[in-house]
């Protein structure tokens, strides 16, 4: 009886599953009949795939109750290698969006059931919604995203083609709507507006901005970026697009706009008042409010304790400046000092090392310039992370190489934990370990090391590239014979 119930349960589960499993024999034919499909390329042994599977299945179930135009699909790359190879799948799980069988792009949305469902359902309809009555306009304006609205004289207007292409490329960033009727105005030409998210409306600024530039996609996109969040936007992990490419002033606090809208509004209004009192002085800065929990890694990097919130940080190129315990007067003074170049940058750094006897010099943010930019020394730098397995394999060999060249007067081998210290410009660390060679006389142009990771590989590289020939090794990396 138990066996029978188990079988019935499995049959019921299989029949209820809304995830389609496709193979090389039916992949293309099936996808052509699906308006919008999210395809999961996976491997059964993959841990991340196993974690995603129940969320993916639940998302498919949610979607099936709301629309027939979106389907979730899975492909087992261990048995369907040709399909996975065709779409450049190199890791698991890989998620891609298809429209009627054509690849539409990578999936960059949430990985939980509701998030996946909402993300994909939003792609089922047209990229821009047509509005025909005045009463509909307020209804389509988004509460949490900017709404970009095109008022055009006819559906054949050239603006529509540019507008639709832009809407497709910005589907994650804004809501797009258009109308062929003169709903609010009767302009002699077309009009393009961006409306603030409803939840950001205040008495301190207009609800929308009107575009005055040329009808060129990149120009319009930059304009949306500038005006879509208003003078003080609400910055979250999903909308960082609006806060890039500019000096950014972020007010962090322990209240989210979803849980404490009145508290967020109060602090935003205080910042807005400062900006309205100084409209020209701070016009080149972008301002935002952020929920501290959404950016806990930033809070940690800046060394801000919970009892110091609300706090303000200015992110300016590769430098950061922080103000703890926000007040209106302190904030205004902080901004003025930044504009006048009177602030001291915040530097994330481990303490200076007390033991300097190791062959590999320990770098922290506070001694980096002194050691690496010493014009009398060639320096090799390893940027590592404590959790990195490749780093753990490298460091004993790197330390051995350092021991073998420790008596070289013009050479230093050093290492920095890049997760515990700010990495200065122009160094770029996108993975671990990252290694640079910094010759004397060329400190502004460090060379990325792409050589082998064994002790001898490192020594041969140093012997060959050293500004001055090493005392203990020839240019080929061979040990020099001691003179009797």
UniProtKB/Swiss-Prot annotation:
Its main location: endoplasmic reticulum. A motif (Prevents secretion from ER) lies at residues 481-484. Keywords: Disulfide bond, Endoplasmic reticulum, Isomerase, Redox-active center, Repeat, Signal. One of its GO terms (biological process) is protein folding. One of its GO terms (molecular function) is protein disulfide isomerase activity. The active site is at residues 46, 49, 388, 391. The record marks 111 as: Lowers pKa of C-terminal Cys of first active site. SUPFAM superfamilies: Thioredoxin-like (SSF52833). It holds the Pfam family Thioredoxin. The record marks 453 as: Lowers pKa of C-terminal Cys of second active site. Residues 15-125, 338-467 form the Thioredoxin domain. InterPro entries: PDI_thioredoxin-like_dom (IPR005788), Prot_disulphide_isomerase (IPR005792), Thioredoxin-like_sf (IPR036249), Thioredoxin_CS (IPR017937), Thioredoxin_domain (IPR013766). Its EC number is 5.3.4.1. Belongs to the protein disulfide isomerase family. This is Probable protein disulfide-isomerase ER-60. It comes from Schistosoma mansoni (Blood fluke).
